[in-house]
A protein has these predicted regions:
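Zinc-dependent metalloendopeptidases
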Residues: 33-281
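A residue-level detector for conformationally permissive "hinge/kink" positions
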Residues: 12-14, 183
């Protein structure tokens, strides 16, 4: 598999062939990783005023956070105002909606990123360019692009706009974020949502609602307006950490048989790669 783009929804016949993630109609992102995606608080949301809001995304009612002028969905996915404005409409469902044209994603890296995180970005870009059909290309004068910005000097989180929105988009990375979590955030950029929000997740996962922090349960809601490609993949780089948003240190997500699992922030699984390549054939 070489570099070629893809993003969002595909036909059920293709989905049956592909191993993979959860893709969802429209474009929005989220990312998590607090020293291993430990989402005890929303990415960089603990010290800033935030407002819980209700909205519509592809015809589905959702809960999101308004903070610093950004709309955070599922913790680390940033929705544009336009996406929310259009949200009451029926799901787009089209394969080209929110997909980067030709699978080409132009990017820049903020000057204050630092060499360590810059190297992590390079490693993550190499993973995408060598294993998926997307092409991450250094920007010259392109008007539609992504900028990697430096988030916090003490955290290990990140966030990103989801899918192709046009104009300048952002991927924010904290100082101690891992390469795997950079890949996770970039996954939102290409159009991937979180694996635990798939429509079929209850066949494979048991959400431990009693262990979730007060006011954070909405981050575990199923996003039924999305399109799932391939079988559920608990090892996906887009899965939440088992203790995400835990209020007591106990798991908030277990397997359906009530056993724990080890989450992946090492890199792509075969299912992740197949899903992205289904989006960007």
């Amino acid at each position: 598999m070489k570099t070629k783009p893809r993003v969002f929804f595909y036909s059920k016949s293709l989905a049956a062939k592909v191993m993979g993630l959860s893709l969802m109609t429209a474009a929005f992102l989220f990312s998590c990783d607090k020293s291993n995606d430990d989402l005890t608080t929303s990415p960089d949301q603990s010290s800033q005023k935030e407002e819980v809001r209700k909205g519509q995304l592809n015809g589905q009612s959702i809960t999101y956070i308004k903070k610093d002028g950004l709309n955070f969905f599922q913790g680390d996915i940033v929705l544009s105002d336009k996406q929310l404005e259009e949200g009451a409409a029926a799901s787009k469902g089209g394969a080209s909606y929110s997909r980067w044209p030709g699978g080409k994603i132009y990017y820049t890296v903020a000057g204050n990123m630092g060499s360590i995180n810059a190297n992590k970005i390079t490693s993550a870009v190499n993973e995408y360019n060598s294993k998926t059909n997307t092409q991450w290309i250094p920007r010259t004068t392109q008007s539609n692009y992504v900028e990697f910005i430096f988030g916090s000097s003490s955290g290990s989180d990140g966030w990103a706009h989801i899918g192709y929105q046009g104009g300048k988009q952002t991927i924010s990375l904290d100082q101690y974020i891992s390469v795997g979590s950079v890949i996770h955030e970039m996954g939102h950029t290409v159009g991937l949502y979180h694996e635990h929000c798939r429509k079929d997740r209850d066949q494979y996962l048991s959400i431990q609602w009693g262990n979730i922090q007060n006011g954070q349960a909405y981050n575990f809601n199923i996003y039924s307006s999305g399109t799932d490609i391939g079988p559920f993949n608990i090892n996906s780089v887009m899965m939440y950490w088992p203790n995400s948003y835990s209020k007591n240190g106990l798991p908030t997500i277990k397997r359906a048989n009530n056993t724990t699992f080890t989450y992946n922030r090492t890199g792509f699984t075969t299912g992740d790669i197949n899903t992205i390549n289904a989006m960007y054939p």
